[in-house]
Design a protein with these regions (language model features):
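A cross-family phosphate/adenosyl-ligand binding-site feature
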Residues: 1-124, 129-166
């Protein structure tokens, strides 16, 4: 698929165990010609985990995209008035971020970017990543599924035998 001249906002929230996959998808999009603009949640910017440091992850993503990324509410807000994204992706999207998005809470750069982008009637693609909270998050996921211009990457419960209530 040729994504030349396509501007993709790529929101990254704090599902740290999926960051290696996230990097690969961002790399793939850039190889297909897309101009990817990373948008980092505050947790992504500040939490060092067993999966790596925030600084290293952000540097890798910025190196792949050639873009310094969006890191503040003030940097995210102009996405709406300027309308420069063709599509926005939130991957990974935590249950917490999905709940906030479903309830119009815009207190992180990713959520502000999503709200600003949605006002232009362009697609928002969500790759949910809630680990054990999929069932508890489904009320909010359902609200988002019923929202025009929001699309979901197919998802499933990660381990239904060992975690039947997740």
């Amino acid at each position: 698929m040729d994504l030349s001249n396509r501007n993709i906002g790529y929101g990254i929230t704090g599902s740290f165990c999926t960051f290696a996959k996230t990097r690969k998808e961002i790399q793939r999009l850039t190889e297909m010609g897309a101009h990817v603009i990373p948008i980092f949640s505050y947790q992504t910017q500040n939490c060092d985990t067993r999966f790596g440091t925030a600084k290293e992850f952000m540097e890798e993503v910025c190196d792949i995209t050639g873009n310094p990324g969006i890191r503040t509410l003030q940097e995210a807000e102009p996405i709406g008035p300027k309308g420069y994204l063709d599509v926005m992706v939130i991957a990974p999207c935590t249950g917490n971020s999905a709940a906030k998005l479903a309830n119009a809470i815009t207190d992180t750069p990713v959520l502000m970017a999503a709200k600003a982008h949605m006002r232009n009637g362009k697609p928002l693609v969500i790759a949910i990543s809630t680990n054990d909270a999929l069932g508890a998050s489904f009320k909010n996921i359902g609200m988002l599924m019923n929202t025009k211009h929001i699309y979901f990457v197919p998802f499933a419960q990660d381990n239904y035998e060992k975690k039947p209530n997740s």
